[in-house]
Structures are given as structure tokens and as C-alpha cells.
Amino acid sequence: MRSFVFTGLLLTLFCVHASPSAPQTDAALWPANPTNQAWPVTQPLNPPEGLRPCCAFGYNLKAEALGVPVPFYQLGNVIDTQHLGEHHYNDSNLGAVTNLLGINSEKVGLIYTRRGGFIDLAHVRDTADNTFYLFSQILPQLGQRWRIDLQPELALRRIQFTEFTAPADPAERYALATYLAGKLAFQLAAWHEIAQWYGFQSVPGFSEGVSAFSPEDLYSNLLGAHLAIQTILTGHAQSVSEFNQAMTDLLPTALAQLDAVSVTETRVQFDLLDGNWWDSHKRVPEKFLVLKRNYDTSDDRLPTPVPDETLPPQRLGLPDNIDSYPLSALAALQLWPGSDRGTLPPSKMYFTAADFAMLALQARSADAQQILQKR
């Protein structure tokens, strides 16, 4: 992957100088009401550098390479709210390396929550970062026709922005840019699940099919969008360091609201689902190490229901409209397949979020047939 030189963090002031409020921890699971404040904002950021390396569903996972078991390797995969570490905006490949080596102060892993099911912290953090990145790009150009091109995932990922009359009020512009960024960041996450299923490999020769549509993935991504929106709307997008600190503070509170459990209890939940949701006898990256998948790509969703859980699930959703502005009319994620399109079906020119349900349904049907053939 290309490495990016990080841009300076000079502040552009959009309104009066005011101290940002603390993230609203009592409302962490649902984005705050549109702000009446246009806070100072960092200069446009470089995009996050790839995705954090985590996690196949399960724990103490073994691995193989080219069909040969890798000895003495186990992926613990489980974390609790006491050991989340410090959030770091992922603008360097160094973050991925330090995560793999276990020396990053930011921690990732899976945690079971009684109201949100399993949560993958890498997915939470990745979508939070993408929301912050997109917000920093969108706000200065809100209402203009322009585009962002991102690194390919089976297709060139392009966000095309539409020309429109943006709100005159700075606070309304700030809120509109925030929610639009969260919406698009979640769509990028949904496409990543689709791309993994249809053959995307971030490391050539290493299949990512095991991770595609994993039951916890997109709910975790949606949680990340929520937390970033909350962080931005409460004035913590003034610099990368301030965003990092706000996310560090907000994440454990959000997990507590979802009734997160201990490492031991998370492992117990995995054990109860062994043979139904995952197969502890298989190795990463065998696709059917994961037996249970969630093919819903909507940004209004419940967690994948875990058998015998008695607490009511927490629904998460993103708005389709802010005031009189339909978000889908302001920007569109376009996926332009190139020569390396995996097994993606033919498209007219490009895919959009409107095609996600169809692509996911085809994946679900194919997986069901494969599982039947293996029985």
C-alpha cells in the first residue's frame, strides 16, 4: 500500500471560539441531535491507511498457510473493556504492523455484549476513522460537485458529490457534513464485506472469504460510525489528537451501555456457539471456519441475535435525511470494477449502495448451497 505524508493540523475556524463539550456518554449509542455549534475543524486529512488486522470469528484460532498448518500460532482474539488502550487514527501502515506484533497501545479484538452481540473493535475503530476522514474532506466543499477516489477493493471506490445549495448556517452545514460522512463510511464498510466475499485479497494469495459477512462485522462498523458522529458533533474534530482522545474516552462507555462482559464470559459465549456459528477445528483462512453470517447491509440494524440471550437488543441506525436534505442525493459511493474484479457479476458501469442487497443475496444463496454440499 502507498504510504501517505500526514498533513498538518492547522485549524480552520468556522464559528466562535468555544471549548468543546465532553462526548455525551449517556447518548453514545445514538448520534447526538444536530449541533447548534459549528466547531473548529482540522484541515482535510489523509485517508486511513488500510484496515486494522483483526478478527476472524472465534478465539484461540489456529492458522494455515498454503494449506499447511502454522505450528505454535494461536490468535487469542478476545478483549475486555479494561484493556482497550488508546485510539489512534490509522493513517500509517505502522499501525497495522504494531497491532500484529501486539505492541500498539491501541487494542483490537472481539468482545461479547448482551445488547449488541459480538463486537469487533477493529471494525468499530476503522469506520470511526473513515467517518472523521470523510467529514474533514466534505465540510470545506459541501455543496460543490467533486469526488474522492480511494484505493481499490475489487473496484475503484469513488465517492461522487453532487452540487447543491448547502445550508447558509454554519452549524447546519457542520451537522449535515457529519451525518453524510457517517453514512458514506458505513457504505464503505458494507462494500468491504461484499468485496471480501467476491474475492478481494489485501494480501495476494491470502483469501479473506472467512471474514466476509461475519455475524458481528457490520453492526460493529455501524457502532463506529455512531461514535465518530457523536465525537464530531460534540466538538472533538479539531485535531487528530483530540479525536483520538474523545474516541478513547467514549468507546468503553458505549460498550458498557451494550452490557459488555469479561474475557472469560466472551469465551464462554464462543464455546456455546462452537459448531453452529464457527468451527474451532478449522484454521484461518478456511472459509467455513465461520458457519454463521449476516448478509444484511442496511445501516438500520439489530445485532445478529445470539441464542438464549435474554436482554433486548440495541438497534442502531443512521438517518436518511437531515432537515430537508436527503443524504443519498448529496453523494453516492460508486464501485468501478477493473480487470481484477474477482467473481463480481457483470455490471452496467459501476455498482452503488443500491446494489448491495442483491450482491449479498447472491452470496447468501451460494454459501447455503456450499454448506449443504459439505453435510
What annotation goes with each model-predicted range?
Residues T7-F14:
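Bacterial N-terminal signal peptides
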Residues M1-F4:
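Positively charged n-region of N-terminal signal peptides that target proteins for export
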Residues S19-V210, I229-R375:
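Bulky hydrophobic segments
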Residues E193, D217, L223:
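Divalent metal-coordination and catalytic microenvironments
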